[in-house]
Amino acid sequence: MATMTVQEQGDAQEGVGAGGVPVEVAASYRARTRGLLGRDGIDGALMITPCNSVHTFRMRFAIDVAYLDKEFRVVDVVTMKPGRLGMIRPRARHVLEAEAGAMAGWGLRPGVRVALRP
């Protein structure tokens, strides 16, 4: 489990609480394939890497999806309802998934940088 903070022009802005946002990292093929399928929600976010597109087939809840480039800068943020296929983002190398509405509260928007720490 890692912790995420949002950085804007070199200044760190903490996410949820003083410790940032808890992030699960899905880097293996099996973990990337499973993603958030079968869950009723998530506390924090899930980072899928490498990844540049997602779907919400068989999902039980709507999610926010942030596409990150190789430097962890946000390329795009979208909200997806269950049963949708997201567009491929060629510049994206990583994807963050969270419950719908969470990313706006964390300050995630195109152009900001995400920092992960153990």
Identify the role of each PLM range:
Residues 1-118:
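Compact, glycine-rich, soluble single-domain proteins
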